[in-house]
């Protein structure tokens, strides 16, 4: 707003063929620069031994907080995984069948295959169940602290059970 007013006054002065100094007679130079102010701020915080604000150490970790962070992380990981899989399908030579035959020729044990399938399906199931939980919140259901913890535990149990079930297929 101030910049627009200053621009308007400046244009008015130019139109009137006056110098800007005549139009802005009460201009006061700044006492300090932003750099000096930042240096003073950081030196004060250093001498008082203050942590960065807001610092992660001031927060008490809770189940809903950790699950929110994990929900965002799984969303990013799943998006990146799908994008990379699509790009690799376009850029890597050969067909899907040839890559599948290559994996079969490695003779991996069933335990390793089951573990890999579980590791792939776990983030998907967690993001799905926690997404349903978020949709319930959008409906106004389960917003008390005790219900947040109960639904969090339910999401974790459902995630493990559905991941084990899908990995066993």
Swiss-Prot record:
GO terms for cellular component: mitochondrial inner membrane; respiratory chain complex II (succinate dehydrogenase). The keyword Iron applies. Pathway: Carbohydrate metabolism; tricarboxylic acid cycle. Disulfide bonds: none annotated. The heme b is bound between the two transmembrane subunits SDHC and SDHD. One of its GO terms (molecular function) is electron transfer activity. InterPro entries: SQR/QFR_C/D, Succ_DH_cyt_bsu_CS, Succ_DH_cytb556, SuccDH_FuR_B_TM-su. Residues 30-62, 138-144 are mitochondrial matrix. Keywords: Electron transport, Heme, Iron, Membrane, Metal-binding, Mitochondrion, Mitochondrion inner membrane, Transit peptide, Transmembrane, Transmembrane helix, Transport, Tricarboxylic acid cycle. The N-terminus is blocked. Residues 93-112, 167-169 are mitochondrial intermembrane. Residues 1-29 form a transit peptide. The chain crosses the membrane at residues 63-92, 113-137, 145-166. Its cofactor is heme b. It is found in: Mitochondrion inner membrane. One of its GO terms (biological process) is tricarboxylic acid cycle. PROSITE patterns: SDH_CYT_1 (PS01000), SDH_CYT_2 (PS01001). The keyword Repressor does not apply. Component of complex II composed of four subunits: the flavoprotein (FP) SDHA, iron-sulfur protein (IP) SDHB, and a cytochrome b560 composed of SDHC and SDHD. Membrane-anchoring subunit of succinate dehydrogenase (SDH) that is involved in complex II of the mitochondrial electron transport chain and is responsible for transferring electrons from succinate to ubiquinone (coenzyme Q). SDH also oxidizes malate to the non-canonical enol form of oxaloacetate, enol-oxaloacetate. Enol-oxaloacetate, which is a potent inhibitor of the succinate dehydrogenase activity, is further isomerized into keto-oxaloacetate. Belongs to the cytochrome b560 family. This is Succinate dehydrogenase cytochrome b560 subunit, mitochondrial. It comes from Bos taurus (Bovine). The gene is SDHC.
């Amino acid at each position: 707003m101030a910049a627009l007013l200053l621009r308007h006054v400046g244009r008015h002065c130019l139109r009137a063929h006056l110098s800007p100094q005549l139009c802005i007679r009460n201009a006061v130079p700044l006492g300090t620069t932003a750099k000096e102010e930042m240096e003073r701020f950081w030196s004060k915080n250093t001498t008082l031994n203050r942590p960065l604000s807001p610092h992660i150490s001031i927060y008490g970790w809770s189940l809903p907080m950790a699950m929110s962070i994990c929900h965002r992380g799984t969303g990013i990981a799943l998006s990146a995984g799908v994008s990379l899989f699509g790009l690799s399908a376009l850029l890597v030579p050969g067909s899907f069948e040839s890559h599948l035959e290559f994996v079969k020729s490695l003779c991996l044990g069933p335990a390793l295959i089951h573990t890999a399938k579980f590791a792939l399906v776990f983030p998907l199931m967690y993001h799905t169940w926690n997404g349903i939980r978020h949709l319930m919140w959008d409906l106004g259901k389960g917003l008390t602290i005790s219900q947040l913890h109960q639904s969090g535990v339910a999401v974790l149990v459902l995630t493990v059970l559905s991941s084990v079930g899908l990995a066993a297929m």
